[in-house]
């Protein structure tokens, strides 16, 4: 009999993590989902679906705000959650490469600090799972290990910087709290269905190709030699559910990254061939592409964030051997990009005109 508390609902990873947990774990008594008041109405239909699929579990939509003391929960919810929670998943964050620093700092850093202070009050806590990102490495290059965190390199954007600062806060509590830190790579849709809620991350390539589909020749963007570390959502949630209950994962920081990543150039070529049935021709110098994307009209037309191009020249590589040592026991493996590209393109094709799927480009 266990209770699980989640921040970050109704975000994509959180939704899929709840579903995976209930599909694989017995005796889940209570699921507590912290939501901002403005997001409660959109969360209710999702909860109804959960209730139909998993009638033996009680679901609680709890209004709150991670940036406030006690997560801004009312006293009644606070008491119930404290009594019934054994596992906490902190996923709430600003996932936006173009976010302003003040906003990212408030949610990613202050929010994480408030979650940590609140978690210390839980008397029945068995594990805190904190979702960081592999890209807390910032502009570090070379092999990046799971045991490494502190560095003096700068960052490509405020998202990376504030997630780095937040992870430092969590890492400092490892001796006091039962913590596992998850560092995902770039998350994409389900490997078997292609399903995703937002066309961000690797889908920006498809946005770019869709906008230029009428051109007889479409070039590469720069040399594209950087590593493209993309992982499907099903690998992320299966791994996380297993690691939650693994004693070997307690106190660890783990890269949920692709152990066999491909280059950006190769990924771009694969997606173009599957999406447009043509191969790239030539190359546009990356500085020229960045200059073009300084124009808001160009960014909105292409549906591409300018900050995404910073990853085209980054020379880092993620070592995920510690995660693999633990996950190998459960035979949980990351599918290759080549094996999942067909479903990714198929799903994008079916939903490319759905504006709710596209992220806001300013």
Regions found by a protein language model. Name each.
Residues 242-305, 325, 348, 352, ...:
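Mid/C-terminal beta-alpha module of Rossmann-like enzyme folds, strongest
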Residues 12, 28, 319-362:
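Amphipathic terminal alpha-helices
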Residues 193, 204-235, 239-243:
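A conserved pocket-lining segment of Rossmann-fold NAD(P)-dependent short-chain dehydrogenase/reductase
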